[in-house]
A protein has these predicted regions:
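Hydrophobic/aromatic-lined pockets within catalytic cores
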Residues: 48, 52-55, 77, 226, ...
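Long C-terminal interaction/binding lobes of large macromolecular proteins
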Residues: 233, 363
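Short, solvent-exposed segments of well-ordered alpha helices
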Residues: 31-38, 228, 255-259
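Short metal-coordination and nucleic-acid-contact micro-motifs, chiefly zinc-binding Cys/His arrays
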Residues: 40, 226-232, 260-264
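Histidine-centered nuclease catalytic patch
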Residues: 235-266, 275-290
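Mixed-charge, low-complexity interaction segments
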Residues: 1-218, 283-294, 299
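C-terminal structured domain segments
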Residues: 282-358
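Short Cys/His-rich Zn2+-coordinating modules
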Residues: 211-222, 247-253
Length: 363
């Protein structure tokens, strides 16, 4: 049998596969498969981070190599450049993996970028880095993970544009996304413990979880929501927004691991703080779905880019799987928001909420 890392292409061998079987092949990757570097963990994380960027084509879900290895590069950037975590067992010829060597060469050529977050590296430099990593890393890891998962996860052709994830595997990864992420982090950390010195291992799991940094400046989304939709009330409680306007991830960032327009709403500080890492109550789904239908029609480059892979069923499915992963529901805190605004108990609630929620939710 040809070694997995030598494979140039592979077909999905079965589309009728049980969850038990998929757990079996993932657990094999996490524990039993042979590894000289961490690329399999990196590829699994990049796929999980890209679940909501995949598009249904026929009976499978497509994701481009460009999108996969942009996440792959971003995830490795902090681990290698910021935290100095080695990612490969020494093979007698080199102690650095290709992704480490690419980063080291770029940092040696321009020391300044070592201090930068991945997203703020110059676009030309960042694209060149992603292209080089995609070229060097995919020829080894894509076939290797394909073989370890027995051809049940995806089909691929290294000469073409990306992977095709089977529908069964896609639904499985959505349903068990959080559990798969935790197992992947744990297995990745166990591997890193074997090849790194003690000092860099401090807070290792936190370093892995934070390898995909959350974007902190969401002001551009705030302005689009205010300008294009004239949103001047809290999405959840309907109270008038003041200067302290929060851009909230409708489905928490900790689950989605991405910043996209279709998942943003404006909220008051009280609701944003109360909601925290919860999903909104189910009654809010219709409201955001209606908003997103309007948003998809806006002539704005950022909005267009964010909605390219969006479909009408996305929010319902995301909400469902986030709930299955254990996320609690948040409901409106009308009374608390009114009290904070100095409004007497119950005066604002009915009128504001009726305008902020779908009419059919009221008797």
């Amino acid at each position: 049998m040809t070694a997995g890392w030598k494979l140039k292409s592979g077909e999905i061998l079965s589309r009728q596969v049980s969850n038990d079987k998929l757990w079996s092949v993932f657990n094999y990757v996490f524990s039993g498969s042979k590894k000289r570097n961490t690329y399999k963990f990196g590829l699994i994380k990049a796929l999980l981070d890209n679940l909501f960027n995949m598009t249904l084509q026929g009976e499978d879900y497509f994701i481009s190599y460009q999108m996969i290895f942009e996440k792959f590069a971003q995830n490795y950037w902090n681990l290698v450049v910021k935290y100095h975590l080695k990612q490969m067992r020494s093979d007698g010829r080199s102690e650095y993996s290709k992704v480490e060597s690419i980063f080291r060469n770029m940092v040696n050529a321009n020391r300044i970028i070592a201090t930068l977050e991945f997203d703020v590296i110059g676009e030309t430099e960042r694209n060149r880095m992603v292209q080089e990593i995609s070229k060097e890393c995919r020829k080894n890891v894509v076939g290797a993970l394909y073989q370890d998962t027995e051809g049940l996860l995806y089909s691929f052709d290294l000469k073409k544009g990306g992977l095709y994830i089977s529908s069964a595997a896609y639904e499985f990864m959505l349903k068990y996304k959080e559990q798969l992420e935790k197992l992947n982090y744990y297995s990745w950390a166990k591997f890193l413990e074997q090849i790194n010195d003690g000092n860099v291992l401090i807070g290792l799991l936190d370093k892995l979880e934070l390898s995909t940094p959350q974007r902190t400046n969401l002001s551009v989304y705030r302005e689009i929501l205010k300008k294009e939709f004239e949103e001047n009330t809290c999405f959840y409680c309907g109270s008038k927004l003041t200067k302290a306007i929060h851009v909230d991830h409708f489905i928490p960032w900790s689950y989605v691991k991405d910043d996209k327009m279709w998942n943003f709403v404006l909220s008051c500080s009280r609701c944003n703080e109360k909601k925290n890492n919860k999903i909104p109550a189910e009654k809010f789904l219709l409201k955001i779905e209606k908003r997103n239908k309007k948003a998809a029609q806006i002539h704005n480059d950022l909005v267009y880019e964010d909605f390219k892979e969006y479909d009408d069923s996305r929010m319902k499915r995301l909400w469902k799987y986030a709930q299955l992963s254990g996320m609690k529901q948040f409901d409106i805190c009308v009374d608390q928001c009114n009290e904070k605004a100095g409004v007497s108990h119950g005066k604002i609630s009915e009128s504001k909420i009726k305008t902020s929620l779908p009419h059919e939710n009221f008797s």
